[in-house]
Amino acid sequence: MADRTEQILTPSQLNTLARDLLEGSFPLVWVEAELGNVTRPASGHLYFTLKDARAQIRCAMFKPKSTWLKFQPREGLRVLARGRLTLYEARGDYQLVLDHMEEAGEGALRRAFEELRARLAAEGVFDAERKQPLPAHVRRLAVITSPSGAAVRDVLSVLARRFPLLEVDILPSLVQGDSAAAQITSLLQRADASGRYDVILITRGGGSLEDLWAFNDERLARAIAAAHTPVVSAVGHETDVSLSDFAADVRAPTPSVAAELLVPDQRELVARVRRAQARLSQLQQHTLGQAMQHADRLALRLRARSPQARPQLLQRRQEDAARHLRARMQHILERLQARVQRAQAGVQSHSPQRHLAPLQQRLRAAHPQAAMQRRLQQDHLHLRGLVRSLEAVSPLATVARGYAIVTRQADGSVVRSAAELTQGDRLRAQLADGSVTVVVDTSETG
């Protein structure tokens, strides 16, 4: 009894153990079956059963996931569902909580799509090195699409608004069904071979994977990759991806975006042209201004060399020479004045001030240049007389009369008395015509 008591569980405990066992054993499963008992309450969640001929399982797909379904779930529809097994503990219901669901036919198509994409990628069909850039200016555009679909209306509307001058050819084609891929491929090859177009756009609106299957055709993908003309693919909505998108030189998420990629906005072009015109005008004005300045310089040079300008040139040269001569004379006078001032300073150191005062007065009184020159000559003669007077009392004149100036040979000091000398002193005697060196033998005073 004790052993049995330890194994007794409550319903909630048992359901919890069962839930953990289910979720641990089946983390994620794929199920292909028919829909039944489809309900969608106000909460937005989706509840139904997946069934076959012998069994069924309760399923739930909550609103965040069910909102993205690309089809309307209905009774009897065969689907491929992915989810995790769990158990609703409150009722003990075993169920499958789904995060993805598609129509059963799409499951096979998607597997075929992935296999073909991997094979073409391995062959290098989708390599980025093979892709061509779009031309800067598209003049002629070929659009391969359904002539009655929403895609062609969107493309033409955007092109007309942004760049109405673009030449557009609509190449009508089926975009859905068994023969659509072959027709699109044929139109692409003919448009590429014509050499008429700058870009070829392949486009259609959104749809299911089966609706878009023509754009997953291997021959079409290879034709796009082999085209010499740049190809833009805009198939379905932004979440739809086809092999034509991988093979194309440029992939656009929607037809409208493709049209915007292909042509500039005419308003932006007008603004760019106006800015270019403004820069060109500025450049022209600058260039013209430089040319006019150069022409003015040449005209001045020509006028300077013309016969009419010769007298004026000579007159200017004469005036320049006169100014230079006056400046030169002024410089000479200033130098003479400086010499007189230096001579005055020398005379002041040897004679009374009265000898120079009259000279200074005469210099200050001499304003005209001619009078100044005559006065300078007179003063020069007077200075020569003063110099002769000074020379008469100069020590050199005394030496010339037979005397000598005796200095010590060691330091050059003048010997003024015999008492300053001792036996052996070496002396230098400066005579009128030279000097002699003597050695003191004896000295006598008195």
Curated annotation (Swiss-Prot):
Q: What is its EC number?
A: 3.1.11.6
* Catalysed reaction equations from the record: Exonucleolytic cleavage in either 5'- to 3'- or 3'- to 5'-direction to yield nucleoside 5'-phosphates
Record localization: Cytoplasm
Molecular function in Gene Ontology: exodeoxyribonuclease VII activity; nucleic acid binding
Q: Which InterPro entries match?
A: Exonuc_VII_L, Exonuc_VII_lsu_C, OB-fold_nuc-bd_dom
Tell me which domain of life the UniProt entry assigns to the organism this sequence originates from. Bacteria
Write out the function statement from the record.
Bidirectionally degrades single-stranded DNA into large acid-insoluble oligonucleotides, which are then degraded further into small acid-soluble oligonucleotides.
Family annotation (PANTHER family): EXODEOXYRIBONUCLEASE 7 LARGE SUBUNIT
Question: Which protein, by its recorded name, is this?
Answer: Exodeoxyribonuclease 7 large subunit
